[in-house]
From Swiss-Prot:
A possible D,D-carboxypeptidase, that releases amino acids sequentially from a proteins C-terminus. Has zinc-dependent carboxypeptidase activity on synthetic depsipeptide substrates. May serve to decrease cross-linking of peptidoglycan, promoting the highly sinusous motility of this spirochaete. Overexpression of the whole protein in E.coli leads to aberrant cell morphology and extrusion of the cytoplasm, while overexpression of a construct with the first 62 resides of the protein fused to PhoA does have this effect, suggesting the whole protein, not the lipoprotein moiety, is toxic. Its EC number is 3.4.-.-. The keyword Electron transport does not apply. Keywords: Cell inner membrane, Cell membrane, Hydrolase, Lipoprotein, Membrane, Palmitate, Protease, Signal. GO terms for biological process: proteolysis. It is a lipid-anchor. A lipid is attached at residue 20 (S-diacylglycerol cysteine). GO terms for cellular component: plasma membrane. This is Putative DD-carboxypeptidase TP_0574. It comes from Treponema pallidum (strain Nichols). It is an enzyme of class 3 (hydrolase). Its cofactor is Zn(2+).
Length: 434
């Protein structure tokens, strides 16, 4: 490409481009909106058609399987479209509200009960841009043009002065995937993937994908370039028997790269740029040498964050899901991916399920454990709590037989007792205190 400069009357220089033929070799950088299938196809070396393939079997809620990264998800709805609307391509379906009444839930929180007209529905795009964090930790945001913005815990939305109760939420993919687009594919990228050029994206951007054809992208490029706000893992905890259906979960606590504590503002900045998590499975290989399989995940169904002041990303796995085929207990390397940050890598071991019987009783301060053998209970510990309440007992060592705990239990009250083994996943039981 040749360039010439022309002197304008005001004394400024005007850049003239001569010989446009070479522009076809130009690469454009910016952000694209990719479905989960489009994103993970390049990462996993699979065709997007395979990732999108579904079957005619309905799940327990009556929804049809529409592929490994099915947009229909009760977990998606449960974790809140408010948090998803910043980084993800979200659609919300609602029924027209005829009347509503304010009530309280079991925890005393205010909620609305609606009378709706199911024959009048509205599907809208939910999209918001993060603006600031208030002194009280409240996330301040604005609606993106042509979309609705949902408040935290929103149960409805407004369109043209009409209110609609939210009945379903679909998360189709990620809105801001950094991509490199060849000049000849730029038009298709804009039309199919909502590509927008952005000067913040360069050839050195961490996570950069290259558009290869009109419907495929390369694996992401991993950059070693440091950033002053990079994060690392602080601690990783594990849990089992999630109420959201996970077989196992990792709680990844974050801190600054220099080892200092992460502020709430810094954590919110991170999650507002958070995209996804990659799971690499090593089976029983504690050295993380022999990779058995890699899995793509879907935010809200497999990973999530909360608006509280704990800098934590939760990562769950359900061994029976199509996208986790061949997975099971063992060693995993989790890679947390966020725009503008180097990858955060967390190693975790998910323990096998305890298949034996265990009997639990509560009376006064005494917890009685029976059924399991003494060896299984070696180095075991318990947590005890009532629904919606802080833990009464946390991480107290127990053994077979009677154990005197550090709290009194109210007779007739139901408690959750979680027994955590050394070599098995934890066991939970609902127990009414005597």
């Amino acid at each position: 490409m040749k360039v010439k400069y022309a002197l304008l009357s005001a004394g400024a220089l005007q850049l003239l481009v001569v010989g446009c033929g070479s522009s076809h070799h130009e690469t454009h950088y910016g952000y694209a909106t990719l479905s989960y299938a489009d994103y993970w196809a390049g990462e996993l070396g699979q065709s997007r058609d395979v990732l999108l393939a579904g079957n005619a079997e309905a799940d327990r809620a009556g929804d049809l399987d529409a592929g490994m990264f099915d947009a229909v998800s009760r977990a998606t709805h449960g974790h809140g479209a408010f948090r998803q609307q910043f980084q993800y391509a979200v659609e919300v379906l609602g029924e027209k509200v005829l009347s509503k009444q304010e009530t309280e839930d079991s925890r005393g929180r205010k909620k609305w009960e609606y009378e709706t007209d199911p024959s009048v529905t509205k599907m809208v795009r939910a999209s918001a841009s993060f603006q600031d964090l208030g002194e009280d930790g409240e996330i301040k945001f604005e609606a993106v043009e042509g979309a609705v913005a949902l408040a935290d815990r929103a149960s409805s939305f407004m369109v043209d002065s009409e209110e609609y109760k939210i009945t379903n939420v679909k998360v189709h993919g990620m809105k801001f995937v950094p991509v490199a687009v060849p000049h000849e594919l730029k038009g298709i990228a804009k039309e199919k993937f909502h590509f927008v050029e952005d000067s913040r994206v360069t050839e050195n951007t961490n996570g950069l994908k290259t558009m290869l054809t009109e419907d495929s992208f390369s694996a992401r490029k991993v950059s070693s370039m440091e950033s002053p706000h990079d994060l690392v893992v602080d601690t990783v905890g594990t849990g089992y028997h999630s109420r959201f259906g996970s077989d196992a979960e990792a709680s990844v606590m974050l801190k600054r790269a220099d080892g200092s504590e992460l502020s709430h503002r810094e954590f919110i900045d991170y999650v507002m740029n958070f995209n996804t998590v990659r799971y690499d499975y090593y089976g029983d290989d504690a050295s993380y040498t022999n990779l058995m399989a890699s899995y793509g995940t879907k935010h809200s169904a497999d990973s999530w964050w909360k608006t509280g002041r704990v800098p934590r990303i939760s990562c769950g796995i359900n061994y029976g899901f199509d996208r986790f085929k061949g997975s099971g207990p063992g060693y995993y390397r989790l890679t947390l991916i966020a725009n503008g940050y180097r990858d955060v890598v967390a190693d975790v071991r998910f323990l096998p399920k305890y298949e034996g019987n265990i009997d639990i009783g509560l009376k006064g301060k005494v917890l009685t454990i029976g059924g399991a053998d003494a060896e299984t209970l070696m180095d075991a510990a318990v947590d005890v709590f009532a629904d919606g309440q802080p833990k009464l007992v946390s991480d107290q060592a127990v053994s077979l037989g009677q154990n005197v705990l550090s709290a009194d239990f109210t007779p007739g009250t139901e408690y959750t007792v979680e027994v955590r083994f050394k070599e098995f996943g934890s066991v939970r039981a609902k127990v009414v205190a005597q």
